[in-house]
Amino acid sequence: MSIAVFDSGVGGISVLKSLVEVMPNEDFIYYGDSANAPYGTKTLEQVRALTCEHAKELILNQHAKGLVVACNTATSAAVRILREQYPDVPIVGIEPAVKPAMLFMENPRVLVMATPMTIREEKLKKLMDRYRHLGEIIPLPCPGLMNFVERGDLYGDDVRQYLEELLYSYSHDEIDAVVLGCTHYPFVRKMIQEVLGDRVRVFDGGNLSLIHISEPTRRTPI
């Protein structure tokens, strides 16, 4: 039996890589729904339906013993429902690294980059509200950014221009940290760092799922 890793495209590959490093003796199934990407500009109902459909395939037909929803948008839309539907299967989602970003210094000013749907959802709003007393949190929807990653355009002029326009006001402001709230965004992390400057700390929440998935699945024999 394998651990399934699901994402709306190629973004979750970075999460899969980390899982393989932590659990080298496990077998993994990766499913990237590039045919329906991007999820971040879809409605809640659309994302929920797609996520539940693919989870059903991976758990019931592919017999996955655990599921990592390696997509912030799908996590916000459906992970609670999936846990109710499959109570005996360890299911974890991805959470933007707001907590470590707010704790790395006193009174930080933190930019949270995410898809429009992730920004709208209550899950992220509640997470940000939990740490607002520690500093300033600025949510920034990034429509279209994951499309560059899906196309493999990680270093070209088009993605640089997109990021420069998106981040212009923040590259000249006192931003202390940026949270990459989508598993696609680490693929353009270097360019984000270049646009914002070296003084800005970049946080990626992709590894937060590893602790939660590793122990329960290790107790389930392959």
Please provide the spans of the model-predicted regions.
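Non-catalytic structural scaffold of enzyme domains
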Residues: M1-S214, R218
